[in-house]
Curated annotation (Swiss-Prot):
Protein name: Ervatamin-C
InterPro entries: Papain-like_cys_pep_sf, Pept_asp_AS, Pept_cys_AS, Peptidase_C1A, Peptidase_C1A_C, Peptidase_C1A_papain-like, Prot_inhib_I29
Residue positions assigned to the propeptide: 20-133, 342-365
Source organism (scientific name): Tabernaemontana divaricata
Coiled coil region boundaries: none
Positions annotated with a glycan in the UniProt record: N83, N121
Length: 365
C-alpha cells in the first residue's frame, strides 16, 4: 500500500471527524480582534463541504461559493458577537446568497394566499374566550404525534411537507398510529398547486379529501422533483380542514393545544436562513412565503417544525418568539388544521410501517 494512499485515507478520516464537529468552530470569533484569516475561513469551508457532501461543477463555481460562504460567515460571526436571543450558524445554505436561498427554498405562493383569505371558512372551534384554561406548555413530539424531521431539498414544496405533517399528527392523535405519509404524491398529483414552484395548504387538504386519502412515504417516496401522478393507496384520510381565527395568537395557542397546526410565515431573512439555536426574534416581515408547522409552545415561544432537514436550526426545529397579534413573521395570519373523526378505521388499513416514537428522535426544546 503506497504512502500517498495512506496519507489520503488519513486526511479523509480527519476531515470527516472534524466535519461532524464543525459546530465547535463556528463561534470562535471575538469582535475585539481582527476577523478570521482567509486560511481559517478556507479550513472551515472545506469541513463544511465535507459535512454536507457539497460538490461543485468546477473551480470557478468552487471559488464563487467560497466568497459567498465567507460573506455569510462574517454576517453570522457579527450577529453572534452581539446580544441576541438566538444564535446563527453554518447551515446547508451558507454557500447561497439570500436571493438564491429564497428562490429555491420558499414555496408558499402569496398570490394564492391573498385569493384564499377571502374564501376560507374560519372555524370558531378555537376562538379564544376569557377564562379558557389552556396548558402552560405543550409539545406534540413528546406525545409521539410527530414524525422525524424531513427535507424538501431543492424544491419549493414546503406547502406539501407542512400539510402532510399536520395530517400525520391528527391521524396519530385520533387512531394512535404514527405513519409517515407521502409529500411526493401531493407534488405530483395535486394539480391546483404548483409542485416544486409553490402551493397552498387548503388545496393540499382538499386534494386529500377528494382523493379519499393519501399514501405512505414508503409506498410513494419523495424525489424533490415533480413527476407524473401515479397510482397510490388511500392509507390515511381526513374529514376536512378549518382556519383558526386570523391574527389571534391566543386562538392559535388554543388550536395547538389540541393538535399541530400549519402556518405560513415570512422566512426570507438572512437571519432565518442561518438560524441555529435559541428563541428567534427576527427581523422578518409579514410576506407569507414558507409553510411550517407549530408542534407546541412554551410561555414565550412557539415550537416550529421546518422541512429543511436536521442540519438547519435545532435539529430541524426553530423556537419563534410569541409577540401577540399577527405574530412574529406573520405566524398567526393564516393558520389551518385538518379535521378527522376519532376512531376512523380507514387509517388502520394497509399500514405496514408504523413509526415507533423515541425521545432520541426529537430534540426537545
Amino acid at each position: 500500500m503506497s504512502t500517498l494512499f495512506i496519507i489520503s485515507i488519513l486526511l479523509f478520516l480527519a476531515s470527516f471527524s472534524y466535519a461532524m464537529d464543525i459546530s465547535t468552530i463556528e463561534y470562535k470569533y471575538d469582535k475585539s480582534s481582527a476577523w478570521r484569516t482567509d486560511e481559517e475561513v478556507k479550513e472551515i469551508y472545506e469541513l463544511w463541504l465535507a459535512k454536507h457532501d457539497k460538490v461543485y461543477s468546477g473551480l470557478v463555481e468552487y471559488e464563487k461559493r467560497f466568497e459567498i460562504f465567507k460573506d455569510n460567515l462574517k454576517f453570522i460571526d457579527e450577529h453572534n458577537s452581539e446580544n441576541h436571543t438566538y444564535k446563527m450558524g453554518l447551515t446547508p445554505y451558507t454557500d447561497l446568497t439570500n436571493e438564491e436561498f429564497q428562490a429555491i427554498y420558499l414555496g408558499t405562493r402569496s398570490d394564492t394566499i391573498h385569493r384564499l383569505k377571502r374564501t376560507i371558512n374560519i372555524s370558531e372551534r378555537y376562538a379564544y374566550e376569557a377564562g379558557d384554561n389552556l396548558p402552560e406548555q405543550i409539545d406534540w413530539r413528546k406525545k409521539g404525534a410527530v414524525t422525524p424531521v424531513k427535507n424538501q431539498g431543492k424544491c419549493g414544496s414546503c406547502w406539501a411537507f407542512s400539510t402532510v405533517s399536520t395530517v400525520e399528527s391528527i391521524n396519530q392523535i385520533r387512531t394512535g398510529n404514527l405513519i409517515s405519509l407521502s409529500e411526493q404524491q401531493l407534488v405530483d398529483c395535486n394539480k391546483k398547486n404548483h409542485g416544486c414552484k409553490g402551493g397552498a395548504f387548503v388545496y393540499a387538504y382538499q386534494y386529500i379529501i377528494d382523493n379519499g386519502g393519501i399514501d405512505t412515504e414508503a409506498n410513494y417516496p419523495y424525489k424533490a422533483v415533480q413527476g407524473p401522478c401515479r397510482a397510490a393507496k388511500k392509507v390515511v384520510r381526513i374529514d376536512g380542514y378549518k382556519g383558526v381565527p386570523h391574527c389571534n395568537e391566543n386562538a392559535l395557542k388554543k388550536a395547538v393545544a389540541s393538535q399541530p397546526s400549519v402556518v405560513a410565515i415570512d422566512a426570507s431573512s438572512k437571519q432565518f436562513q442561518h438560524y441555529k439555536s435559541g428563541i428567534f426574534s427576527g427581523p422578518c416581515g409579514t410576506k407569507l412565503n414558507h409553510g411550517v408547522v407549530i408542534v407546541g409552545y412554551w410561555k414565550d415561544y412557539w415550537i416550529v417544525r421546518n422541512s429543511w432537514g436536521r442540519y438547519w436550526g435545532e435539529q430541524g426545529y426553530i423556537r419563534m418568539k410569541r409577540v401577540g397579534g399577527c405574530g412574529l413573521c406573520g405566524i398567526a395570519r393564516l393558520p389551518y388544521y385538518p379535521t378527522k373523526a376519532a376512531g376512523d378505521e380507514n387509517s388502520k388499513l394497509e399500514t405496514p410501517e408504523l413509526l415507533q416514537w423515541s425521545e432520541e428522535a426529537f430534540p426537545l426544546a
